[in-house]
Regions:
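Glycine-rich hexapeptide-repeat left-handed beta-helix
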Residues: 1-14, 20, 42, 48-77, ...
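Mature N-terminal segment immediately following signal peptide/propeptide cleavage
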Residues: 20-22, 26
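Short hydrophobic motif
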Residues: 25, 37-39, 58
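Short Gly/aromatic-enriched secondary-structure transition segments
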Residues: 33-37, 54-55
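Short proline/glycine- and basic residue-enriched helix-capping loop/turn segments at helix->loop/beta transitions
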Residues: 82
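Short, contiguous, helix-prone interaction/anchoring segments in small proteins
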Residues: 26-33, 44
Length: 148
């Protein structure tokens, strides 16, 4: 175990012994990391309100930020989830076996269902659901960033 592991308001991160935490990752407050997870460089999990949980065998790649909402929304990452570099997961639910692309954003109350995919750069707006097989390109749950 490595990185900044810091308590906040009486809650301390709980990390499975088999998890990898990069030396400059930060886990703050009510954060739970499951077995065989990997939390890569410059990733921040800030459980300064409701908690954050990351299920076993999931990996949060470099620069990912996971945060909660002051109004009681947790952030949950299921089992066997891959979260690409620089993604932002804010007070949302990512179910088992999902994939979040690089630089994607998933906002408050959104749900990415088991086995679903969110494309790189996509934004899943608050309260939306990304369904398995639909992906974030179906227009119902995500908006694509403007280009040029």
């Amino acid at each position: 175990m490595s990185g900044l592991i810091a308590p906040f308001k009486g809650f301390a991160p709980r990390i499975a012994a088999s998890a990898f935490i990069a030396p400059n990752a930060a886990l703050i407050g009510e954060v739970e990391i499951g077995a065989n997870c990997s939390i890569w460089f410059s990733t921040v999990l800030r459980g300064d309100g409701p908690g954050i949980s990351v299920g076993e065998n999931s990996n949060l790649q470099d620069g990912t930020v996971v945060h909660v909402a002051a109004r009681g929304l947790r952030a949950t990452v299921g089992r066997n989830v891959t979260v690409g570099h620089m993604a932002l997961l804010h007070a949302c639910e990512i179910q088992d076996d999902a994939f979040i692309g690089m630089n994607a954003t998933v906002l408050d109350g959104a749900v990415v269902e088991s086995g679903a995919m969110v494309a790189a750069g996509a934004v899943v707006t608050p309260g939306k659901v990304v369904r398995r097989g639909g992906g974030s390109s179906d227009g119902s749950a995500a908006r694509w960033p403007r280009c040029c």
